[in-house]
């Protein structure tokens, strides 16, 4: 068999040919005329590195490198994509933007927890209440920034879920143990609490609108829970996180509106005659200490949504030139500015209106107890209806991690995406399981202090630890000491607030009435 001839080295003319267009010559100059005397010999370059003047449009290798560089800058950091992510509701759609991020963060960050902040002020007073709320707000805003930055901290990897980031920082097994329970509660537990609050608020709305005309055969509380759950299941059929951006916008608008209405209506009415702004005192010093810890736990519980930050950011496209953390942080700044405009007026205005007479149920309970006959029924009914809309919208975003987990288990076993019927079945199942837990544990929404302590590390502690373990700042530097100290301070507060929440349950005589919701 004949041997293949060696590849010849083709010579490149030193100057462009006469027919070369002007646009192909350097700086668009006309091609120089050929020499009048014919060249006696043709010079062939013997080096693979051509002089710059020999290649007006660049060598083929240079063009390939330039094109490849541009492609990588547009596509990203050579991120290794998991094919399964294209089948899951959190990462199925990656066309999010800063507006979607603002909608989702507002929907997740403003909710029923803010309505009980004046209860904490009743135990802390003016100075300590405002100071504690301000410190907690700044602290959680910083840890939010940490999570946004850690989403793509390792080149070639996007941490699309909170548990994934915890596993990368703490290790596979320890990360699951530390992050799974609080994130599951903040997802499934919040969904259950939303069913309880949404159902009870629908019942109050019905009573206000109908008045004495509808007292013959009203629905029970459990039946209102079922009505609210059915509405949640219908809305949960939207396929992925980006598809509920419209619902998040509705939830954000309604949450801001009813938060403003609640404190404005409270401040505009005459204050109770026996109002006092002295912090509530307990018979013993230890009792007062635990009451303060429980109040701080209520403040910590008011800041929610950090378990969804990475999930929201994973819905955005990310490239080397346009990383996802830029629009995510832009949307987060807008949303948390609006969140501050909600929680601070509620806390200060609510405590000013009711003082230490604030009932444990929060602002809605205070409005209903003190001003049911003073405020026009239309305004009161509107406020309650907005709370229902906000709870319906919040249920969708807090349930999305649970939907994602169900579908991840299915797709990993079958190696195919969920069909419409399977996806709908998972969401119906989750909705009715949440309803069942709400009926079985009707006291769940009254454990704000305890639950705030148990879930506090997700917001205030773990992000600081993960920053040190992933970014690896210089040991014993200020950055190293600051994040370790802030993280361990969050863990200490978590233990203290949990103890305060348990003490509050014991002192107030919380009756664990299983399967006995209020009538």
UniProtKB/Swiss-Prot annotation:
The keyword Electron transport does not apply. It comes from the Eukaryota. It is a multi-pass membrane protein. The chain crosses the membrane at residues 115-135, 136-156, 177-197, 218-238, 244-264, 283-303, 334-354, 378-398, 428-448, 450-470, 486-506. Residues 1-44 are annotated as: Disordered. Residues 1-114, 157-176, 239-243, 304-333, 399-427, 471-485 are cytoplasmic. Pfam families: Aa_trans. Keywords: Amino-acid transport, Cell membrane, Membrane, Transmembrane, Transmembrane helix, Transport. Signal peptide: none annotated. GO terms for cellular component: plasma membrane. One of its GO terms (biological process) is amino acid transport. Disulfide bonds: none annotated. It is found in: Cell membrane. Residues 198-217, 265-282, 355-377, 449, 507-519 are extracellular. Coiled coil: none annotated. Belongs to the amino acid/polyamine transporter 2 family. Amino acid/auxin permease (AAAP) (TC 2.A.18.2) subfamily. Amino acid transporter. This is Lysine histidine transporter-like 8. It comes from Arabidopsis thaliana (Mouse-ear cress). The lineage of its organism: Eukaryota, Viridiplantae, Streptophyta, Embryophyta, Tracheophyta. The gene is AATL1.
């Amino acid at each position: 068999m004949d041997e293949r001839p060696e590849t010849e080295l083709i010579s490149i003319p030193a100057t462009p040919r006469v027919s070369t267009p002007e646009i192909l010559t350097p700086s668009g100059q006309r091609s120089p005329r050929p020499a009048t005397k014919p060249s006696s010999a043709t010079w062939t370059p013997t080096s693979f590195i051509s002089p710059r003047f020999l290649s007006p449009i660049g060598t083929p290798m240079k063009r390939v490198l330039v094109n490849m560089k541009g492609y990588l800058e547009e596509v990203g950091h050579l991120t290794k994509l998991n094919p399964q992510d294209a089948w899951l509701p959190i990462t199925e759609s990656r066309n999010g933007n800063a507006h979607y991020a603002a909608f989702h963060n507002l929907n997740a960050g403003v909710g029923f927890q803010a309505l009980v902040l004046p209860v904490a002020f009743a135990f802390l007073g003016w100075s300590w209440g405002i100071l504690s709320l301000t410190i907690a707000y700044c602290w959680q805003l910083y840890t939010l920034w940490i999570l946004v930055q850690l989403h793509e901290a390792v080149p070639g990897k996007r941490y699309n879920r909170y548990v994934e980031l915890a596993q990368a920082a703490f290790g596979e097994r320890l990360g699951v143990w530390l992050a799974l329970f609080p994130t599951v509660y903040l997802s499934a537990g919040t969904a259950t609490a939303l069913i309880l609050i949404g159902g009870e608020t629908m019942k109050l709305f019905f009573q206000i609108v109908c008045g004495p005309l509808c007292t013959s055969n009203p629905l029970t509380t459990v039946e209102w829970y079922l009505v609210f759950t059915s509405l949640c299941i219908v809305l949960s059929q939207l396929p992925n996180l980006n598809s509920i951006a419209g619902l998040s916008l509705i939830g954000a608008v309604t949450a801001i509106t009813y938060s403003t209405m609640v404190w404005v209506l409270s401040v505009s009415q005459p204050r109770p005659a026996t109002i006092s702004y002295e912090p509530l005192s307990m018979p013993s010093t230890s009792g007062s200490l635990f009451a303060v810890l429980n109040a701080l736990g209520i403040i910590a519980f008011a800041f929610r949504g950090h378990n969804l930050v990475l999930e929201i950011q994973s819905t955005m496209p990310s490239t080397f030139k346009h990383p996802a953390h830029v629009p995510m942080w832009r949307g987060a700044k807008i949303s948390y500015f609006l969140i501050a405009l909600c929680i601070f007026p509620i806390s200060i205005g609510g405590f000013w209106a009711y003082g230490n007479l604030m009932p444990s149920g929060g602002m809605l309970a205070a409005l209903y107890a003190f001003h049911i006959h003073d405020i026009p029924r239309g305004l009161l009914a509107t406020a309650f209806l907005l709370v229902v809309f906000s709870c319906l919208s919040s249920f969708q975003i807090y349930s999305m991690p649970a939907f994602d987990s169900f579908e991840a288990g299915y797709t990993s076993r079958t190696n195919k995406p969920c069909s419409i019927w399977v996806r709908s079945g998972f969401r119906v199942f989750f909705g009715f399981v949440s309803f069942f837990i709400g009926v079985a544990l009707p006291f769940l929404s009254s454990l704000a202090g305890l639950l705030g302590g148990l879930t506090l590390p997700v917001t205030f502690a773990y992000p600081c630890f993960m920053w040190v373990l992933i970014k690896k700042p210089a040991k014993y530097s200020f950055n190293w000491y600051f994040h370790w100290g802030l993280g361990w301070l969050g863990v200490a507060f978590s233990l203290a607030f949990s103890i305060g929440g348990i003490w509050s349950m014991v002192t107030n005589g919380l009756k664990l009435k299983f399967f006995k919701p209020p009538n």
